[in-house]
């Protein structure tokens, strides 16, 4: 089935055309550059503190700033914040973030440039996650109720020339939407379209959409489904991109880059925010880097091709055959290049992810699965160390024949030998020397015509190593594999050269886009970086793509004026006690608004309920309420233990 259109082109990056939405003096969409946004963490009632944060963000390069508006007092504070900014020479647009309370939106729209509403809770109550049956008639009545409550805001925004963002979050869909569409990207899209139809009915068009989730795969799918719907409807509204509750540090940047960057390479997105559990100005540099990296993709790509197999409506991992003769992990395999001289280094085990004294290593959950040896030789000490690693279960590979490793054969060399009309020249190559070994082929920049050799060679593994246009070339190759019903596993072998920060983002964008589409059985990242960096990045990418969970996954909101405790300090404290629990997902939320709903992907939740009090969740269910802040960390650990997910730190194999 041919893929329904969701972007301008699948073979190259071409920005999706949109109308222009004006937010104060800043235009979004059209031919405007991709805009950078952030959000203050101060109490909105603290006018001076909020002004200072907005100014600091603007000075860092932020173009639009959002503040939380829970009620009328916060709405009134926005008048003074806006005036204070103008008095100090800052015309940066101000956005009010609204949840649950339409009167606050009606008040604050007098003072700000844009209002963000959440269609999941603007009119509907907080989801109870209960089964509720809606027939068509009762469902229609609910839509009428939404229209009655929402239309006054639409009319006022239109009259005052204010902008609006209809911002759906995966975790805060209404009971009504979930009972008809499920807790799915399809529900996210329909939730937003309901509100957009009301805007259009009132001839109001100065709005844009967002589809945020803490899971990058869900987020990517939701945005693609939305653009697919807009192409079908012939709508052209801009999009604000973001992964909500991405967390902090490298993991937060990886999740954000995977979600935001994947869409930017598709040409989707007009404004972005990297939501980090850090001071808000730390979000600006990753945004700037993402935009720069995505811009380099503009008009880059491969020859046009038609996709029949990659479907955005139902994402499934490609079905492959894993040979018992090639070491592979079913949830995603990590290859690492290893210079042969590293075998004598004391830091070897730390670099590849083992533990234990030198000569007696032990595997951990993030130990490299396979090592690709550079310039292997017959040094006895090095061979002894290799045998130790091999006995441990780590696969050894090389690009040249070596007695202890499996050989990776470049398809280019095979084609060159085929071009020479000599039986001897073909079989004097490394292909013959690997007789009896599984066949592992490396594809670089060969053409589709040259790929056909793969059919007759029947490899057990393919290393995919395009040097340019990595994403589009890889998509085209996977489509060709599917068309020819070839179920060979494929490792994404991408080489990078930039700064560490850029490589973290670009590798997450490129590998993440493919992995989130179910394409690729692992990663092999290369470049002028230390092995530890590449290994940790590889495992983090697999985890962010929800393939292989090698460490605790933290879902933490970026904090805002609603937050009831110091989110950064609490997050670090909880991480220090629970970071040894691979596969466990823990959400740390500053308030009830960003609590049970927004942490839809978590196993356990730690949520501020009122000043000095914490609620604990298992999934979406609140199991302990109003715990004293001082006791909450211990109670969280006890809760994890009670559900059989706790491992003592000294015994964990992580």
From Swiss-Prot:
Its EC number is 1.17.7.3. GO terms for molecular function: 4 iron, 4 sulfur cluster binding; 4-hydroxy-3-methylbut-2-en-1-yl diphosphate synthase activity (ferredoxin); 4-hydroxy-3-methylbut-2-enyl-diphosphate synthase activity (flavodoxin); iron ion binding. This is 4-hydroxy-3-methylbut-2-en-1-yl diphosphate synthase (flavodoxin). Keywords: 4Fe-4S, Iron, Iron-sulfur, Isoprene biosynthesis, Metal-binding, Oxidoreductase. It is an enzyme of class 1 (oxidoreductase). NCBIfam families: ispG_gcpE (TIGR00612). Gene3D superfamilies: Dihydropteroate synthase-like, Sulfite Reductase Hemoprotein, domain 1. The keyword Iron applies. [4Fe-4S] cluster binds at residues 557, 560, 591, 598. One of its GO terms (biological process) is isopentenyl diphosphate biosynthetic process, methylerythritol 4-phosphate pathway. Belongs to the IspG family. The keyword Protein transport does not apply. InterPro entries: Dihydropteroate_synth-like_sf, IspG_atypical, IspG_bac-typ, NO2/SO3_Rdtase_4Fe4S_sf. It holds the Pfam family GcpE. Binds 1 [4Fe-4S] cluster. Its cofactor is [4Fe-4S] cluster.
């Amino acid at each position: 089935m041919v893929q329904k259109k969701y972007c301008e082109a699948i073979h190259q990056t071409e920005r999706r055309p949109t109308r222009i939405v004006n937010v104060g003096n800043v235009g979004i969409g059209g031919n405007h550059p991709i805009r950078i946004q952030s959000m203050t963490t101060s109490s909105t009632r603290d006018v001076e503190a909020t002004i200072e944060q907005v100014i600091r963000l603007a000075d860092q390069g932020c173009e639009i700033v959002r503040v939380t508006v829970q009620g009328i007092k916060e709405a009134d504070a926005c008048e003074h914040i806006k005036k204070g900014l103008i008095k100090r020479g800052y015309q940066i647009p101000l956005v009010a973030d609204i949840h649950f309370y339409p009167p606050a939106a009606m008040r604050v729209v007098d003072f700000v440039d844009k209002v963000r509403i959440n269609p999941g809770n603007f009119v509907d109550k907080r989801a109870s996650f209960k089964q509720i049956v809606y027939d068509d008639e009762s469902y229609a009545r609910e839509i009428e109720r939404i229209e009655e409550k929402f239309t006054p805001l639409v009319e006022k925004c239109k009259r005052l020339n204010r902008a609006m963002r209809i911002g759906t979050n995966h975790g805060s869909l209404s009971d009504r939407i979930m009972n008809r569409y499920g807790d799915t990207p399809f529900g996210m899209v329909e939730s937003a379209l309901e509100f957009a139809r009301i805007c259009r009915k009132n001839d109001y068009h100065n709005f844009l959409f967002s589809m945020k989730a803490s899971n990058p795969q869900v987020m990517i799918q939701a945005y693609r489904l939305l653009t697919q719907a807009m192409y079908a409807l012939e709508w052209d509204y801009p999009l604000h991109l973001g992964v909500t509750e991405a967390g902090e540090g490298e993991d937060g940047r990886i999740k954000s880059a995977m979600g935001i960057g994947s869409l930017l390479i598709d040409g989707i997105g007009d404004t972005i925010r990297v939501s980090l559990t850090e001071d808000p100005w730390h979000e600006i540099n990753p945004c700037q880097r993402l935009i720069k990296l995505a811009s380099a993709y503009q008009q880059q790509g491969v020859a046009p091709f038609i996709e029949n197999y990659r479907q955005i409506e139902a994402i499934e991992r490609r079905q492959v055959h894993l040979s018992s003769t090639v070491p592979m992990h079913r949830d995603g395999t990590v290859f690492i290049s290893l210079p042969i001289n590293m075998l004598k280094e004391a830091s070897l085990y730390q670099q590849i992810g083992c533990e234990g004294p030198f000569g007696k290593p032990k595997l951990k959950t993030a130990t490299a699965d396979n090592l690709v040896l550079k310039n292997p030789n017959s040094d006895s000490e090095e061979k002894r160390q290799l045998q130790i690693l091999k006995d441990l279960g780590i696969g050894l590979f090389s690009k040249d024949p070596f007695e202890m490793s499996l050989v990776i054969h470049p398809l280019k060399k095979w084609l060159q030998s085929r071009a020479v009309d000599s039986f001897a020249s073909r079989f004097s190559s490394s292909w013959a020397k690997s007789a009896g070994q599984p066949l592992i082929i490396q594809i670089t920049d060969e053409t589709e015509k040259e790929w056909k050799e793969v059919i007759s060679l029947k490899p057990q593994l393919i290393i995919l190593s395009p040097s340019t246009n990595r994403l589009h070339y890889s998509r085209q190759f996977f489509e060709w594999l599917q068309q020819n019903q070839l179920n060979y596993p494929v490792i994404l072998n991408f080489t990078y050269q930039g700064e560490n920060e850029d490589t973290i983002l670009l590798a997450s964008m490129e590998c993440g886009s493919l992995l989130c589409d179910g394409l690729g059985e692992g990663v092999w990242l290369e470049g002028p970086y230390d092995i530890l960096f590449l290994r940790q990045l590889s495992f983090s990418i697999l985890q962010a793509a929800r393939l292989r969970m090698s460490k605790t996954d933290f879902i933490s909101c970026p904090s805002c004026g609603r937050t009831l405790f110091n989110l950064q300090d609490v997050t670090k404290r909880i991480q220090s006690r629970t970071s040894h629990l691979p596969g466990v997902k823990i959400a740390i939320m500053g308030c009830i608004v960003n609590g049970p709903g927004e942490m839809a992907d978590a196993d356990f939740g730690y949520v501020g309920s009122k000043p000095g009090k914490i609620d604990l969740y298992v999934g979406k269910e609140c199991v302990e309420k109003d715990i004293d802040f001082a006791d909450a960390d211990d109670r969280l650990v006890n809760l994890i233990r009670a559900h059989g997910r706790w491992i003592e730190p000294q015994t964990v194999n992580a």
